[in-house]
Amino acid sequence: MQLIDIHTHIYPDEIAQKATDSIKSFYQLGGGGMDGTEKMLREKGKEAGISRFVILPVAIRPDRVMGINDFIRSRTAGKPEYVGFGTIHAGMEAPAEEAERLLFMGLRGIKMHPDSQRFAIDDLRLLPMYDAIQGKLPVMLHMGDQRYDYSHPVKLRRILDLFPKLQVIAAHFGGYGMYETAYDLLKDKDCIFDVSSSLMFMEDGVAERYIRAYGAERMAFGTDYPLWDPVTETERFFRLRLTDEEFDQIGHKTAERFLEL
């Protein structure tokens, strides 16, 4: 079965381990054995049977956005196994202009992590960008954190009400650790979801229940490398009690349709 990993991150080799450790520290996680390099992603992906990877960057500081986007382009351009996204920060001078530059560079979407970037999904500074990219660039949003409300699902609902043509991937079943709240707020909105960084925290049968409530056609497979080992996450995914059709849909068809791969 073909697999597309819709949720991965890579870093320059010289800072990859430090960046990975920083992410784990942010979530108070330890170990894992992943180093955040492109090389390890490819090795682990091959072992897991993953054929394509969506590469998602995040800029914690506004002044690093352009350099990070240039790095992602340099690592993904001309490589059919990669789908490169750029990143945006609400604190940068002109988010909409950088989004246009991403299009020019051939990057395929925008990734934002509101909790680590410290701005809300519905930050007023982002509204012109959301308007400009409707129907042009999809947005992958980290969703949910019990410590902050930057990425609360209600904020995404507001944005989707304002910009109904905005293409959004709501990561982590729409809200890490707040799955029922996310479902109540987003079940009727036009967005898709990924399963990353969630399956290990759900009790038996919960993932299947939400997958079927949303519909497999709205769910996409993701590992959140280097937070987790793609091999382990792929095995965890295939332990779900789903039909072959549901595995096929989540494993690659949703990503292919949504990202026009």
Question: Where do the model's predicted regions map?
Answer:
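Mid-to-C-terminal alpha-helical segments outside catalytic/metal-binding sites
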Residues: 1-9, 13-52, 216-220, 231-261
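A generic "structured core" feature
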Residues: 3-11, 102, 129, 162, ...
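A cross-domain feature marking catalytic cores of carbohydrate-active enzymes
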Residues: 8-10, 57, 86-90, 112-114, ...
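Active-site environment of divalent metal-dependent phosphoester hydrolases
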Residues: 11-14, 60-63, 90-94, 117, ...
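A general structural detector for well-ordered alpha-helical segments in enzyme core domains, enriched
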Residues: 40-44, 68-75, 98-102, 125-129, ...
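Active-site gating/metal-coordination segments in enzymes
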Residues: 51-52, 60-140, 145-146, 201
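Catalytic pocket-lining loop regions of alpha/beta-barrel enzymes
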Residues: 108-109, 119-220
